[in-house]
Amino acid sequence: MSSAGNKGSDAEQCATIFLQQQKLTLLERNYRCRFGEIDLIMREGDTVIFVEVRMRSSDRFGGAAASITAAKQLKLTRAARHYLAGCEGDFPYRFDAILISGERENEIEWIRNAFDES
């Protein structure tokens, strides 16, 4: 049985491959700063996409989507602002979620614009 850290890493790898198959480009994985961590930073055209990857083996407590709380969203938006501050130029950006849920880990749901900064 794999540990939670390995499962998270496996889920991020699965999400990366899935998004690359959708023609997105990986910019960074596991970006960390004092505000938090962003699982994946991708690019689609000119748009920078901050991706939160969630895996849940069961929907018992609301599933993967329910685990992206308002507090988590705030951390992600702060970390995204920190990342963008280090970039030259002004880029459109959005927050997406990749949800891997259920007993079969090959089920992937991609939610574009999963949340905004409000």
From Swiss-Prot:
InterPro entries: Restrct_endonuc-II-like, tRNA_endonuc-like_dom_sf, UPF0102_YraN-like
Coiled coil: none
NCBIfam families given in the database record: PRK12497.1-3, YraN family protein
Family statement drawn from the similarity comment of this UniProt entry: Belongs to the UPF0102 family.
SUPFAM superfamilies per the UniProt record, alphabetical: Restriction endonuclease-like
UniProt GO MF annotations: nucleic acid binding
Protein name: UPF0102 protein NE0711
